[in-house]
Structures are given as C-alpha cells and as structure tokens.
Amino acid sequence: HIIDRCVDEMSGFPEERFEWIKWTVETAQKVTDSIVAIDSSDSKTIYAGLEAHDGSKNRPAINSFNLEDGRQELVPMAKEHNALLFANASGNAGMPQNAEERVENLTTCMEMMDVDDIPMEDRYLDPLVFPIGAGPEFGMHYLDAVGTLRERFPEVHLFGGHSNVSFGLPQRKLMNDVFVSLSIQA
C-alpha cells in the first residue's frame, strides 16, 4: 500500500508548505507502515518531505516526475533518497493529446531514469486518465498507451487515476469497474 501526501493547497508560501509536508510525512509514518508518496507541484516541497522521511521504516515515493520544466530534478533526488519514482505522461507542452504522445513522453521519462540508474522495479508509469465525458476518445488513448507501454516496459509498474474516466457521468462505479478491467486486459 502507498499513502499519498500532498500539501500544495495548504499554503501559497513555500516555507509553510515545507513545514506542512514535514509534519504530514512524519505523522503518516507514525500511524502506518505503508509507503508514503510525497506529492507536490514544487520540487523543493518534495525535497523537504524526503528529508523528513524516516528511511528506517520503509522507502519513500516521489509523486511525480514528468517532462514539465523543473520536474526532471526529481530523478536524481529519487536516486539520492532511494525513493520509488512515479512518472506521468505530461509533456513539456502540456497534457498528452493521444496514446502516441503518452507513450513518447513516458519513454523519454524512462530514458531519463536510465541515466540515474533508477531500478526498473522502482518505476511507476501513469499514462494519465482523462474523463470520457469531455472526450469519448480519451478512454482508448489511455488503454492503447497502456498496451504499448506494457509491451515496451514489461518490468515497470503501470498505474493511473482510473476513476477520472467517469467524472461527471452517471453510473460511475460501474464505469470505473469496467475501465479497470479493460486496463488490466490492455
């Protein structure tokens, strides 16, 4: 199990976020043996969380690295802290528009992780699930990317926010269950 900790909405002031992430990481480690994923849009906040993490209990995880400006520094940070590393398919120009961009962006992320010798079993790839209510093709973009990534990188973990697929639609539970099943089969 992995528990995600994010404090980005707690404060607009970096110093306050650093204190909040330290507190939330330390508190989570007091009440669970689960891996703590340190999640922020700010690399310095992630670093503060990694510094507060007690590595004698378990390893931390970083959520998440992508091709957006400033996120690449998380790769050597993961190596330095022996952290699991989550990568998502967001590109330097923004969100991926199709399956091919998802695969291309995550392949580039994989190459960057290779440079820092991040072990394959420590890599988690998120092709990004978008709501099909906003675009019916979004479901297939994700599923096609999952299939290609599974073939290309069979030893890495694939994951995603599967419940995003049904956002704004009725029968969400049924749709989510079907989408998870399709993702497993992809």
Regions found by a protein language model. Give the residues of each.
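Glycine-rich, proline-tolerant flexible connector loops at the mouths of alpha/beta enzymes
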Residues: H1-S34, I46, V129-G139
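Short beta-strand/loop segments at the ligand-binding rim of alpha/beta enzyme cores
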Residues: V31-A37, S56-I62, F153-F167
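Short glycine/serine/threonine-rich phosphate/pyrophosphate-binding segments
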Residues: T45-Y47, N176
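Active-site-proximal beta-alpha core segment in soluble small-molecule metabolic enzymes
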Residues: S56-K79, A83-A87
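Catalytic alpha/beta core domains of metabolic enzymes, predominantly
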Residues: E73, E80-A186
